[in-house]
Amino acid sequence: MEGTKNMSTKTNKRDLSPKQREDLLKALKSRFEKNMSRHKGLDWTKVQARLEANPEKLWSLNEMERTGGEPDVVGQDKKTGEFIFVDCSEQTPSGRVSLCYDRAALDSRKEHKPKGSAVEMAAAMGIEMLTEEQYFELQKLGEFDTKRSSWIATPPEIRKLGGALYCDRRYGRVFVGHNGAESYYSGRGFRGSLRV
């Protein structure tokens, strides 16, 4: 009986406290209302209802917020009704920089290892790294990564050869670049997306 009691009082580490939940919803609502051009025709009350019905998604959004991503709604999937959140910080999220691309890249470094990898951090946060297509779509909503850059999901055929892709905006246009996946920079992080 006592073991059952202890189990029931344990909280899932992916649960937010009521205060965290309230603060996050307030920040998300404020950002949503200030940036209506990112999600024309969408209604915050419907977004909030979805969020409240999916507490594990709130935890992931809180991780996006905590690491500097400033997540916001950028669309809605017409088939599933899911709202699509993306990191909309002006520069790549500051809490996600100095990461190599993935675990294989991290393991390949003999010395001067970075603190982690973008792919693993995204998975731990419960989000997906942006694809090249998603990154270009985001750039239609504003000017992002004008001073920094963001790793993007890299096709397996490029990754197999040791490379990884990143994107940024310079000189008024968006670029896709490549580096060895084991490289890391203080000015490069990654942007994520989450469907709710």
Describe the function of each predicted region.
Residues 2-128, 132-196:
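A binding-site-centric feature that preferentially detects glycan-recognition modules on secreted/surface proteins
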